[in-house]
């Protein structure tokens, strides 16, 4: 185009790189056409909105922002609602008031409610496998977390902890036992013992510590662990650090798990406030047997040794139910003579309460035992090993009391200045402080001297329950958990393990001696009677104690608690025989009331089952005992051990297994010479030679004579 064309419209000049374009450099060409050359970087100017359009545009933008805000708010609100209703961690569903756990099939197997407050789920956050919350629904601060742990493919575990930030509060969670098809086991030896657990009435949470069940109907027994197991393959273990209290409510079928430091013998660890924590681990597996095996291997110690073989093979003979405190030298020698005259073997002969001048002495009462050394020599010549009864008390009239006070060997009152005196079943005295190294050495030193002087084989360690300590006390080493005192007492038996027996157990599974059930009454029922024997043995077995002594055949024969005989003192004849038959299949059996106090038939029945024990039962017991140091599996097992999915097996409390191959079904009711017997799946051969291979099967009214126990061996 010609450069002299006239420009009638404004054109934008082209700036050359490096040039400075000012107003004077602008050149306008004359207009010659309707086209104009535009610069390379030209962009048309945006027309400015008129003043009338601006309010409309602002309104539109504002409306759009409001719509977006509403959408975002609704999404946030919906998410918040979903969050407030439930949080999930693998198979666990957490809500404000508790949580539930499902198994791999989606079935609910565990449910728990928070009873000391609800969670504010808006305060919860997740960090990997850890889900933590910092606030309760009422706004108070707390520390709560659930951590998911998968220790193996078939097991899922959840670590749960609720800790109050302020001292003085109690933390309580309610664990529901579920519907009638769910069954729970474990916990503690009880006065009225059922298998599975049966809740009765309502019980406010009380300290879960070792106790003498004779002191209270609702007391927990001398052997207990913070462990429960469900037939639906769920298990719970409460942590050792918890100031643990347990109650129950039978109406809602719940167990009340509580942690508190007020109105209790629990004390916070040194340097910590009295703000309690409730912490535990819940694990879910594929079946009840496998999850129990996992929990035992994870949380319980195992015995490192096995007691003497004669304790599994031959009966123990005790002076207690026969002679009580009236025992003396002549009675001991006569008892030993009668045992041999009636051709019975013996694991050992036990001289029980009371052979000393006072409780707390460690020498024989010369009035009752004028020549104890000669008595021991004669017993030894007759082939008897001898054990002695001992306990942790030193009565105020004992020759040892002054020494114990001077050397500060006793549990003391809270200020620590004076020994704490307690009342026990044999008077008033002090209690040895087994947290004190000097007290431990003093006690064991006396036992060693007794063993050396008289060739005593071992000892029966009686008592040891926390219920015999004052509620407020102090020890050489402070105890935040009072049951640790019981554990320290059981440790006194370890040097004498081969034939020793103790009656308390708390975290004591590594003590390689027999754990004795609390004394039984000479009655038929579940209240410390014959029917309670199998449930108690199964419970203690599930708590990790395989070497169990079910106390004396026929019970203690205390007159006011005895189903009496018409022809003399002691338990009635039928009860005695049925008790003897059960005991013959237990890890240990113990006589005190002897069979010859009845008649020749009872003596013959006793001989029959002593021989059966030696030939059939004892070899199996010893084989299983040898495996325990590796596996931790119980010797006496419930039927569901080999049939974990069998709902009938879950609730049977009158049969048991020895290992996996010997099933025992004794008669436990008066006047019966038949019983129903349940055989789980498999091939079973009866003691009569019958083969049962169409199983599982219920044998109704299976005949069992007075001199028989129905037992079956695995034939597959």
Curated annotation (Swiss-Prot):
Gene3D superfamilies: Glycosidases (3.20.20.80), Golgi alpha-mannosidase II (2.60.40.1180). Expressed in brain, liver, spleen, skeletal muscle, heart, lung and kidney. High expression is observed in the cerebellum, specifically in astrocytes. Highly expressed in skeletal muscle (at protein level). The keyword Transmembrane applies. Its EC number is 3.2.1.-. It is a single-pass type II membrane protein. Disruption phenotype: Knockout mice develop bilateral calcifications in the thalamus, due to the formation of calcium phosphate deposits. InterPro entries: Alpha-glycosidase_related, Glyco_hydro_31_C, Glyco_hydro_31_TIM, Glyco_hydro_b, Glycoside_hydrolase_SF. It is found in: Nucleus membrane; Endoplasmic reticulum membrane. One of its GO terms (biological process) is skeletal muscle fiber development. Induction: Up-regulated during C2C12 myogenic differentiation. The active site is at 462, 465, 527 (proton donor). Keywords: Endoplasmic reticulum, Glycoprotein, Glycosidase, Hydrolase, Membrane, Nucleus, Signal-anchor, Transmembrane, Transmembrane helix. The requirement of the predicted catalytic residue Asp-462 to support myogenic function strongly suggests that MYORG is an enzymatically active glycosidase in vivo, even if concrete experimental proof for enzymatic activity is still missing. Interacts with IGF2; this interaction is required for IGF2 secretion. This is Myogenesis-regulating glycosidase. It comes from Mus musculus. The lineage of its organism: Eukaryota, Metazoa, Chordata, Craniata, Vertebrata.
């Amino acid at each position: 185009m010609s450069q002299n064309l006239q420009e009638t419209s404004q054109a934008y000049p082209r700036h050359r790189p490096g040039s400075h374009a000012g107003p004077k450099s602008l050149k306008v060409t004359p207009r010659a056409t309707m086209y104009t050359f535009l610069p390379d970087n030209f962009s048309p100017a945006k027309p400015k909105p008129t003043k009338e359009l601006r309010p409309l545009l602002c309104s539109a933008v504002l409306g759009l922002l409001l719509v977006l805000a509403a959408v975002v708010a609704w999404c946030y609100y919906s998410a918040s609602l979903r969050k407030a209703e439930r949080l999930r961690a693998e198979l666990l569903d957490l809500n404000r008031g508790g949580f539930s756990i499902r198994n791999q099939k989606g079935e609910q197997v565990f449910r728990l409610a928070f009873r000391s407050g609800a969670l504010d789920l808006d305060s919860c956050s997740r960090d990997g496998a850890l889900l933590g919350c910092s606030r309760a629904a009422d706004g108070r601060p707390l520390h709560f977390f659930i951590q998911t742990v998968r220790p193996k493919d078939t097991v899922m575990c959840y670590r749960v902890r609720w800790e109050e930030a302020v001292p003085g509060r109690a933390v309580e969670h309610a664990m529901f036992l579920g519907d009638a098809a769910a069954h729970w086991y474990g916990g503690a030896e009880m006065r009225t013992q059922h298998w599975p657990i049966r809740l009765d009435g309502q019980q406010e949470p009380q300290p879960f510590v070792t106790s003498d069940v004779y002191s209270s109907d609702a007391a927990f027994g001398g052997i207990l662990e913070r462990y429960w197991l469900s037939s639906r393959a769920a298990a719970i273990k409460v942590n050792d650090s918890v100031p643990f209290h347990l109650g129950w409510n039978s109406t809602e079928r719940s167990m009340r798990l509580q942690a508190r430091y007020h109105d209790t013998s629990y004390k916070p660890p040194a340097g910590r406030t009295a703000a309690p924590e409730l912490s535990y681990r819940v694990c879910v597996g594929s079946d009840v047997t496998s999850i129990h095996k996992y929990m035992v291997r994870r949380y319980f110690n195992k015995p490192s040794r096995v007691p003497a073989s004669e304790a599994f093979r031959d009966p123990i003979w005790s002076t207690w139910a026969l002679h009580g405190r009236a025992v003396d030298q002549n009675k001991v020698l006569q008892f030993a003579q009668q045992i041999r005259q009636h051709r019975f073997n013996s694991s050992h002969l036990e001289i029980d309460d009371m052979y000393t001048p006072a409780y707390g002495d460690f020498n024989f009462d010369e009035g009752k035992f004028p020549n104890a050394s000669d008595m021991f020599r004669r017993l030894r010549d007759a082939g008897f090993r001898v054990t002695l009864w001992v306990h942790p008390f030193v009565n105020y009239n004992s020759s040892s009391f002054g020494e114990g006070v001077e050397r500060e060997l006793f549990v003391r009152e809270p200020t620590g200045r004076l020994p704490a005196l307690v009342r026990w079943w044999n008077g008033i005295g002090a209690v040895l402080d087994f947290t004190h190294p000097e007290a431990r050495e003093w006690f064991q030193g006396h036992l060693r001297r007794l063993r050396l002087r008289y060739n005593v084989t071992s000892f029966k360690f009686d008592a040891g329950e926390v219920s015999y300590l004052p509620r407020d006390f102090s020890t050489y080493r402070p105890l935040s958990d009072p049951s640790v005192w019981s554990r320290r007492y059981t440790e006194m038996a370890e040097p004498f393990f081969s034939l020793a027996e103790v009656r308390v157990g708390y975290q004591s599974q590594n003590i390689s001696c027999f754990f004795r059930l609390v004394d039984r009454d000479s009655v038929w029922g579940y209240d410390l009677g014959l029917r309670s024997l199998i449930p108690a043995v199964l419970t203690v077995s599930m708590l990790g104690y395989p070497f169990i002594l079910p106390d004396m055949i026929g019970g203690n024969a205390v007159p006011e608690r005895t189903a009496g005989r018409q022809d003399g003192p002691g338990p009635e004849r039928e009860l005695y025989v049925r008790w003897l038959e059960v005991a013959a299949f237990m890890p240990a059996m113990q006589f005190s009331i002897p069979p010859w106090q009845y008649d020749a038939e009872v003596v013959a029945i006793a001989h029959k089952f002593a021989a059966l024990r030696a030939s059939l039962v004892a070899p199996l017991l010893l084989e299983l005992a040898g495996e325990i140091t590796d596996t931790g599996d119980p010797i006496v097992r419930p039927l569901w051990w080999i049939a974990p999915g069998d709902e009938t097996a879950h609730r049977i409390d009158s049969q048991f297994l020895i290992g996996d191959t010997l099933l025992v079904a004794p008669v436990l009711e008066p006047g019966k010479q038949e019983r129903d017997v349940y055989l789980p799946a498999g091939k079973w051969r009866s003691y009569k030679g019958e083969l049962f291979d169409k199983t599982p099967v219920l044998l109704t009214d299976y005949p069992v004579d007075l001199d028989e126990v129905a037992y079956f061996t695995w034939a597959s």
